[in-house]
Amino acid sequence: MFFFLLAALAWDGEKISRSDAEWKNILGQNRYNVMRRKTSEGAFLGKYVLTETKGTYSCAGCSLALFSSEDKYQAKVGWPTFTQPIAPKNVFYLEDFSMGFKRYEVLCRKCDAHLGHVFHDGPPIKYLRYCINSIALQFEPN
């Protein structure tokens, strides 16, 4: 049954394309800065850093399901952290050297929004830590 749930949440449609002015109007300045200009919110300031409620985290720009609370854990790094996306097809990655070292930016597949970064220092089995900006997410409790 879990497989069917993931298949239903995987996105396979057309991308959303909007102008910068439209995105700024839809998202507001703070979300726009993070999701379109690729900044980060301050550590431990985000709404979902300590949230333990069960549910689904979706893109604040297009509502695409991105992460499940089942994959969330407390890494104590200042941002919500997950071991994997809810469906691999729902995100994509770009190499990012903006901090002087190689890391991988995580973006929403549907609207190209910057979500955060993934690192290879997470818990076993996959050893991945998706470090995601709270402001790029909207949460729907189960």
Language model features: what each stretch is:
Residues 2-10:
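Hydrophobic h-region of N-terminal signal peptides that target proteins for export
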Residues 14-20, 24-58, 64-142:
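A short Gly-Trp-Pro
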